[in-house]
A protein has these predicted regions:
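Alpha-helical transmembrane segments of multi-pass membrane proteins
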Residues: 1-676
Length: 676
């Protein structure tokens, strides 16, 4: 394989495939990494940038060297893998709780090791990228890089669609590296890389023997605890139990029956259960003679486990219809009305914490989602939430939101005898008519509702964050990460003899701005079409396709810089003035066209700006490295959404592009080569 274009496509495909693999695989084994999930993304960008720098000094080293830190990473992760139903104790800060009396602790040393080894592995895999970028005209190189990235996204999306295990993922990575091997005498680095990747495959085989299943979202383990009921753990966390309704101990999970006890004379002809899981909520509804149940579950593998293993076989009942979809998206699509709408245990089983990344249920616990549930109630219908909410302020927040949506505070049933209290929250016309509250139930006072934390909205969909802000542990971790990145980049540049004048502030800021713009697009489409894995994969592919379109335009027509910036700021203004909620129109085809125009137009013009500058650069590899390192800092800036929300993130993006324009005018360092 000698054609540089082919090698560039394969290198870029390998990098993006590996990045997605690590982002998907590591949190499935070490659940607390999921709370720092974009740290893996940031480390990946850092590693790619460092790899490009190092290739200036050692262009002869192939990508196999990245397999050595990858093996160390896999060994570290497996040796600290969380299986939380097994009693374990580790030192560190208590970070999340997931069931009665259990807690998981963050091992800071392991988290730091993960970041270090991800960076090292991605740097190794990126070593061929610098010479390949420098071997052809910049725009030609960039187009083949994007083609490879699209191939990497498509490959991993296909594996997710097929519910393949990590063994297949790592095997495909090995195949990608194998086809990049040059036909020449193997070096020591190549030999060690071969051996390391072989060891990775061996560890994946041993892990496969254990029998875990992998859905598009989770590592799933089916096990039998001491109480005898089959149970499901996701990413090592006990998640669901499959009890026969007739044998279920109501003191263990008391919330299932409460709405039926609250309204004993009411018949529910049609029920909607969002978060139906393996089927227990549905089985309980059927046991209370609910006429028909629409069971909505986002994870197809968990639902299939329920079909095969739930002792009551609720999904085999002709009264039950199953939909595999995001709950919010189902509410948007359906025109049906229901006598009972239940948001079952749809939120993740964690203590209050924050990440810059959306969770699967983020848009299900907003005022707009509660209003959508209300609008799908038949006359006299009831809306119910239940879960282990753990924090009183979270219950108060939901009470305030339901008061805003339904016009009266809900009825609440708590079970304080549990180590982590379970709570049932009910609203709707029949519930509002109950006065006074029955024994065991309560209705929050006006003062309690008024003092509750601010409601979550589609712009700030962060129910587990009490107040806007970034928690101290994230500030400390991000600071340490940036210091590590600064030292590593400076050291790598010095080792590779890359002069400071090769660094581009213009491309650095463009990278940070584009990462935030991409984040905003993903959030928009998650709201409009659901937080499913395939929506995200399609959005990423569409973003990359819009990049290719910009390259094609720039190759055939040298777009004036003023035109590119005017289009960019004009479309950013439109995106800011038309928030995603304004695009919630029917039919879905029209919604898709509007959303695509609003979300992808700024991306197109942003890439006209980038490609217009990139075609002028004298050092394509250094400019690309600057851009990738800027994207790493964009991953840090993403946490600003925890404070200002996702709509105002557009203003941050606009400010960064203004800064990029200024750096192009000032022409410091490598930006001297740019046209004014």
């Amino acid at each position: 394989m000698t054609r540089p274009e082919t090698r560039l496509v394969l290198t870029s495909a390998t990098l993006l495939f590996t990045e997605l693999l690590l982002i998907r695989w590591i949190p499935a084994q070490l659940v607390y990494v999921g709370f720092f999930n974009n740290f893996v993304l940031i480390a990946s960008f850092l590693g790619i940038g460092v790899g490009i720098l190092l290739s200036r000094r050692r262009p002869d080293i192939g990508p196999w060297v990245g397999s050595i830190p990858l093996f160390a990473l896999v060994a570290l992760v497996f040796s600290n893998q969380l299986n939380a139903w097994i009693p374990v104790q580790r030192g560190g800060e208590v970070f999340l709780g997931f069931s009665e009396g259990r807690q998981v602790e963050v091992d800071v040393a392991v988290l730091g090791g993960v970041v270090l080894l991800v960076t090292a592995a991605m740097a190794g895999f990126a070593l061929p990228l610098g010479p390949l970028l420098a071997s052809m005209p910049p725009l030609r190189a960039y187009s083949f890089d994007i083609l490879g990235s699209i191939a990497g996204v498509a490959g991993f999306a296909a594996l997710s669609a097929l519910d393949t295990p990590p063994l297949v993922w790592f095997a495909l990575l090995a195949a990608l590296l194998l086809v990049q091997t040059e036909r020449r005498r193997p070096t020591l680095a190549t030999a060690l890389g071969f051996a390391a990747l072989g060891a990775v495959i061996g560890l994946a085989v041993l892990d496969q023997v254990r029998g875990d299943l992998y859905s598009p979202y989770y590592r799933i383990t089916v096990y039998t605890p001491e109480n005898g009921a089959q149970a499901i753990a996701v990413n090592g966390i006990p998640h669901q139990a499959m009890w026969p309704v007739a044998q279920r101990n109501p003191t263990m999970e008391p919330y299932y029956d409460e709405v039926y006890k609250l309204l004993p004379g009411k018949r529910f002809d049609r029920a909607l259960i969002i978060g139906a899981g393996s089927g227990t909520d549905t089985a309980v509804a059927l046991s209370h003679d609910v006429g028909s149940v629409r069971a909505v579950e986002i994870d197809p593998e968990i639902q299939r486990i329920g079909v095969a293993r739930h002792p009551d076989h609720p999904y085999a009942d002709p009264r039950v219809a199953v939909t595999i979809d995001d709950g919010r998206n189902f509410l948007r699509r359906t025109t049906d009305r229901f006598d009972l709408v239940i948001f079952a245990q749809t939120d993740s089983l964690t203590l209050v914490t924050t990440t810059a990344n959306l969770r699967l249920e983020s848009f299900l616990f907003t005022e707009e989602a509660f209003a959508a549930a209300r609008d799908h109630l038949a006359p006299g219908g009831v809306f119910v939430l239940y879960n282990y909410y753990r924090e009183q302020w979270l219950v108060d927040r939901y009470s305030r939101m339901l008061d805003d949506v339904f016009g009266r505070p809900p009825l609440i049933r708590s079970f304080p005898g549990h180590a982590v209290a379970s709570v049932v929250i009910a609203s709707g016309q029949p519930v509002a008519a109950i006065d006074p509250a029955p024994s065991g139930w309560s209705r929050p006072s006006a003062a309690t509702v008024a003092a509750a934390p601010r409601p979550t909205t589609d712009d700030w969909p962060l129910p587990y964050l009490r107040d806007p802000g970034v928690k101290p542990q994230y500030v400390v971790a991000l600071t340490l990460l940036l210091v590590f990145a600064l030292v590593l980049v400076a050291g790598s540049a010095r080792y590779a003899r890359v002069p400071a004048g090769s660094f581009s502030l213009h491309f650095f800021v463009l990278g940070a701005a584009f990462l935030l713009l991409e984040t905003r697009s993903l959030v928009t489409f998650s709201l409009l079409f659901g937080t499913t894995w395939y929506v995200n994969a399609l959005v990423i592919a569409a973003i990359l396709a819009s990049v290719l379109l910009a390259i094609a335009v720039q190759s055939r027509w040298r777009a004036p810089r003023a035109f590119s910036y005017a289009g960019l700021f004009g479309t950013l203004a439109l995106a800011f003035l038309l928030p995603p909620a304004a695009l919630l129109v029917d039919p879905p085809a029209l919604r898709y066209l509007l959303a695509s125009a609003i979300a992808f137009a700024p991306i197109f013009f942003a890439n006209l700006v980038f490609t217009g500058s990139f075609r002028e650069t004298r050092e394509a590899d250094a400019a690309f490295a600057s851009n990738i390192l800027g994207a790493m800092c964009g991953g840090v800036l993403e946490y600003a959404a925890l404070v200002i929300g996702y709509q105002d993130l557009v203003l941050v993006v606009a400010a960064l592009y203004v800064l990029a324009w200024l750096f192009a005018r000032i022409r410091w360092l490598a930006d001297r080569a740019l046209a004014t």
